[in-house]
Amino acid sequence: MEQYYIVMLAFLAVIAVIDLFVGVSNDASNFLNSALGCRIASFRTTMWVASLGVLLGATFSSGMMEVARSGIFHPQMFSFSEIMVVFFAVMVADVILLDAFNSLGLPTSTTVSIVFELLGSAAAAAAWKLLDAGQSLGDLYTYINTSKSLGIVSGILISVVVAFISGAVIQYLARLLFSFRFEGMYRRIGAIYGAFSITAIIYFLVMKGAKGASFMRAEWIDWINANTSPILITLFVGFTILFQICISFFRINVFKIIILAGTFSLAFAFAGNDLVNFVGVPIAAWDSFKIWSAAQSLSLIHI
């Protein structure tokens, strides 16, 4: 039986590679369209910046891995074989769904896809288990982590609203500041605008994302939380001075720096969040296999 599960794990690993390829094709436009659209750098430079963001962002993804492990359903309510079937069904469905949307040229959220695939697969497995045991489907909620599932779904819906409102407000303010008399306004407040943008990127990227980093120690996170305001003020003042020097003496367009930094941060956030959508389920299956193997070894020792 163990060889059967090893074959399933190998197949899940292959599907993970395919899913990663298909998923990145779907999500790449999210963090590349701004930089490539305005042509502030060459295609190769933009790809290098985005690639670096993905590589570094992968180290911040451990906090999202729990969604695949136990965020949608209660794994203790299922047997190991049922867990493997659930994960297998999720990965196959994800590849087919994303590839179909890519072929049709339709955008889709990989997070929404994986969440509802896990939810649907777990619900189907739980319903089959209840019916096979002659129990009522009313007990289905005991198998599903309803509070966490509702929290994830509501978070996705809220993020759409927040993104729309914040994007509209920031775009309006930016157009109001720089659309008229661009050269004069750029020399006066370009450094302040750039410093605010870079500071905000660092805050959300590093300081808020540090909790999910695999290499961060508890004392480092505590120090960041205790000194958030001084760090942000120092960064804002420092970048304001630096950008003003770049504008006044070197005639450097700091907007190019901001756009590349934004591209890096979006790729970074993609790796820390959406990358789990492609590899989280196979890793959860591997962890389940290790737990099952350890339990089998203990049972043999007791015998």
What are the residue ranges of the model-derived segments?
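Transmembrane alpha-helical segments of multi-pass membrane transport proteins and ion-pumping complexes
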Residues: 17-24, 28, 54-67, 90, ...
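Small-residue-rich segments of transmembrane alpha-helices in multi-pass membrane proteins
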Residues: 116-125, 191-202, 261-271
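Membrane-interface alpha-helices at helix entry/exit sites of multi-pass transporters
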Residues: 40-51, 295-297
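Membrane-interface helix termini and inter-helical loops of multi-pass transporters
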Residues: 69-76, 134-149, 210-223
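Conserved small/polar residues in nucleotide/adenosyl-binding loops
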Residues: 301-303
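Core mid-bundle transmembrane helix pairs that form the ion/substrate translocation pathway
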Residues: 152-250, 257-261
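Membrane-helix interface motif
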Residues: 62-67, 122-136, 204-217, 275-290
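Short, non-helical or kinked segments that cap or interrupt transmembrane helices
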Residues: 24-32, 40, 104-119, 272-283
